[in-house]
Swiss-Prot record:
Gene Ontology CC terms, in alphabetical order: ribonucleoprotein complex; ribosome
Source organism of this protein record: Ruthia magnifica subsp. Calyptogena magnifica
Keywords: Ribonucleoprotein, Ribosomal protein, RNA-binding, rRNA-binding
Protein's recorded name: Large ribosomal subunit protein uL24
GO biological process: translation
UniProt xrefs under PANTHER family: MITOCHONDRIAL RIBOSOMAL PROTEIN L24
One Pfam family named in its UniProt record: KOW
Disulfide bond entries: none
Gene: rplX
Amino acid sequence: MKKIKLNDEVIIITGKNKDSTGAVIKVLDSKVLVEGLNLAKKHVRSNPNAGVTGGITEIEVPLAVSNVAIYNSATKKADRVGIRTNKDGIKERFFKSNNEVIV
């Protein structure tokens, strides 16, 4: 079970966007895409046949998983994730600081 999943609220712990929070929109092997953060400018060539207008656009660039931490909204801080098996035998993720289950 992965510790960071799609739609998790994460906080960036290093780099130019440090202390910024956002939702995970894509999880790769060792990288994540965070909505609205770690933006890079991409030069796009116009293509009238495809209906693409040219110019400079901003896209989200993947961040290393080691540079983000899951955001605990109860404590308003970055937190660590643990994995345990509940009474029904189903694995669940929880915050290590206050033992709350991550929904």
